[in-house]
Amino acid sequence: MTKLMELSALGARETMLAQAMNSHNLANASTPGFRKDLATYAGTRSTDGLKNGVDLSPGTVQTTGNKLDVAIDDSSAQGEGYLVIETPDGGEAYSRRGDLRVDLDGFLVNGAGQFVMGEGGRIAVQRYNEIEIAADGTISIQRLGALPNAMQRVDRLMLVRLDEEQTMVKGEDGLLRIEDGSEAIPD
């Protein structure tokens, strides 16, 4: 009887965790760049139970009209790419969240206020009349008082891709990291 009760309790726990995961996915369905969690179960002999996975399939691209919003083109030969985001501890994490803006301190951040990294580190944008991000990720500005066609390169978005053997995990902050702690390959 005790074994039956243990199995029932374990089944109820796994169902509760799966429902919580589904609720979280539903609540964030319209968040730009959100990657849904996947409930995966170990084999029948495993005692590990429910595992978290992450859906890395591309989301839908939405046209916003915002000049700073970007979407990563998956049709390239290198496969999926990710923006590099600076974590609060100065580390590196990855995201496909492309709703970008310039914060009050002049840095390029995503919609969650996380620093988007360029090839030269954090992307600092001086005061400008015009700003654009080219298809290759190059960020250019027309400085205040400059001639209308005088665009100046600021930096280029740092994009990375995964090695076939690397596995992504999603942190509580919604950012993706490589499971073994290695870094992604620059794109």
What are these regions (language model features)?
Residues 1-187:
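Amphipathic alpha-helical polymerization modules
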